Amino acid sequence: MSREDASQIVEQGDIFFFYRPKVGAEEVSSAEDVQRFYMVTALEEKDRKYRLFILGRKKLPEIVEGKSTSEERNWALNTLTTNNPEDIRKELLAAEYETETKGKRRVAAAAPAGEGKYSIVKHDNHTEFVYALELPEVPGPIQREFEIKKEASYIMSVKNPDIQIPGFKTFEKRTPQYPESLKKEFGDRRWINIEDPKLLDYENTQLLLIGARKKDVEEELGINLNEEKETANTAEIFRELKIRKDQVPLKPLLKGEFPGKGEQQPMAAEVKQLSREEAPGRGGKVGGKAAATRAPSAAAIAKLLSGINFPKRKNELIVHAEANKAKVEAAEEVIQVIKELPERTYSNMADVEKAVAEVR
């Protein structure tokens, strides 16, 4: 069987990557300064369909040729599917909300970090999510930070919402409302391939991405993504999604560079107002992972870290938590949160709880 015979395109279109800085961040120099990392797909068909996904760990899975790593897999969560690109644009706007202790807070608009073409391909006995980057022409520091490659592919599977899986317990109250016709496709399997792309259309659809390849992707799969040479004047991200150039920093998209201090938050003409329930950390779409999942209780974290002698680095927190797994129900869920904490030294439990609030 030839490579071309082995691959079948399930769907294809345009892909866009965005990141949103943390509340109050004046400058972004790494993923630690980022609240959310987004992926937007725009299906290539007469009636365009747009999907907004949140990526876990604030980056794509790592791909290391010929080597398996702990970072090679990641989750993605559908938070919006629409036929109107204006809905996507509004989700990415700057936002303001009121807090009881600090008054009005502002969240910067999501900044574009990449544009390209994507395909979902049925290959042998699995499906792969494939993309080729058009902007920036040469990936820079900001793309490396989010693991955005010039081209890459990932084995992609959809989670059965009726089966609880270790590491996905945080999603148990966020389940996609599939019709019976799609539910039947899962049977008793935990994960299924994406042979029907409608599986991706439902809010709260949960995906697993496993890094597969990062070079010669089109040749290996026998497909053509039809990527084009784009500029600031031709970029689909501005034409298709109606993102205004004066409202977002352009360096990440066009040069692959982090914006300098004062460049991260242009004077946006449009700012949406959030309720307290929509605010970061309260379940809203603007926040960190907490906005997509339930944050673990402080008591659960304290149990896993009981007996620890501070100060400790993050890796030491993880080791201690792993040793105390038997003390906490759904310990893997809590340990996953600890793994997402910023790389720094923690002086006490208050430091840990503050960091949890940053990522959740």
Region locations from a protein language model:
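Long, contiguous regulatory modules within eukaryotic nuclear regulatory proteins
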Residues: M1-R57
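A structural detector for beta-sheet-dominated domains
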Residues: F18-R20, G56, N78, V121, ...
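Conserved beta-strand elements of beta-rich interaction domains across eukaryotes
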Residues: K22-G24, E44-R48, R57-E62, T82, ...
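Intrinsically disordered, low-complexity coil segments
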Residues: E26-S30, E44-K46, G66-K67, K325-V334
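Acidic, aromatic-enriched beta-alpha/helix-loop junctions
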Residues: D47-L93
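Intrinsically disordered, low-complexity juxtamembrane tails/stalks of eukaryotic membrane proteins
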Residues: I88-A108
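A eukaryote-biased signal for long
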Residues: G103-A279
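Basic helix-extension-helix modules of the SAP/HeH family
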Residues: K272-R360
